[in-house]
Amino acid sequence: MSDSPVLALLKDLISRRSITPSDEGCQQLLISRLEKLGFECEVMIFADTTNLWARRGTEKPLFCFAGHTDVVPTGPEENWTYPPFEPTVVDGFLFGRGAADMKSGIAAFIIALEQFIKAHQDHQGSIALLITSDEEGPFINGTVRVIETLEARNEKIDYCIVGEPSSTEHVGDTIKNGRRGSLTADLTINGVQGHVAYPHMVENPIHTCIGPLTELSQMEWDKGNKYFPPTSFQVTNFNAGTGASNVVPGEAQIQFNFRYSTELTAEMIIARVVAILQKHKLNYQIKWTYNGSPFITQPGSLTNAVSEAIFAVNGLTTELSTSGGTSDARFIAPTGAQVVELGPGNKTIHKVNESVKIADLEELVHIHRLTLEKLLT
């Protein structure tokens, strides 16, 4: 029995060892199919990252599918039951790195697109794909650079589905219509190193950081709102000491992260943190890394179209959610586009034996096709 079109395409994509930022020919494979559908394909290479902007049509509205061909490293391949770049079907699941995150999303949209254009060659508006090989890496030469290019030439996306694995138990049970912002701090607290037996001659940075860290961890940053939970503060790394039991360290290095709602801005968080550090009279340096602002797509044309398509395919009433980590949607939403994330289940993403349920894959094709029909016919 031969593979279905979406399964065959997904196997082809998974077999390419596209560990970030490598693309390994995945985008050329997509181009070969998109050009047959009348897409103009533009490859944008920035440093070590390969990006694809493909567009069919010039009219509004512009519907875009966004995704990434890069995958995270496998870890020790001997820990995998099946080789991670040799896609293997077992008991209704396809195993391989990128099976869920997110080559399945790309494959499903391509097949849905082929079906849609065959039936609606004169569809309304325009369709585009924005594909990068930089989503799992430092994300500096991928989607953000393509969006900058589009903005410079006033090419505006109206609707965007990002194909990240949004679902939990069954495809379509959850879609992401927003994400929290992310802000990371690398804090160094300076002390005075010395012998542990002479406390009057040292200043222990571990001791001096306890007060401000306790205050930061116990603070209510906001109450959240109808779309977002309250802002969270978490210490992610703490390093101090020489390893010797008789030496007080000269510095402590602490990394912490905020996942914040639309009730706050990065500037507001930074100001409050600095005020606490100064109140405790610390000798410190701090470096901030801004990973993206929170965004929300209000219920409207896009969320309605996707939700109705999901219900029509599998009878599920989808949940709109803003939980989880950041994605490239954070670079697209600020342009004014309506953005949601829709993809397969996320239980095995980044794990050994990553997999996707083949039945979910087939349903995802139908959901994408119906969404296109609702928005562009």
From Swiss-Prot:
Binds 2 Zn(2+) or Co(2+) ions per subunit. Transmembrane segments: none annotated. One of its GO terms (biological process) is L-arginine biosynthetic process. Keywords: Amino-acid biosynthesis, Cobalt, Diaminopimelate biosynthesis, Hydrolase, Lysine biosynthesis, Metal-binding, Zinc. PROSITE patterns: ARGE_DAPE_CPG2_2. It catalyses: N-succinyl-(2S,6S)-2,6-diaminopimelate + H2O = (2S,6S)-2,6-diaminopimelate + succinate. Pathway: Amino-acid biosynthesis; L-lysine biosynthesis via DAP pathway; LL-2,6-diaminopimelate from (S)-tetrahydrodipicolinate (succinylase route): step 3/3. Zn(2+) 1 binds at residues 68, 101, 164. Pfam families: M20_dimer, Peptidase_M20. Homodimer. This is Succinyl-diaminopimelate desuccinylase.
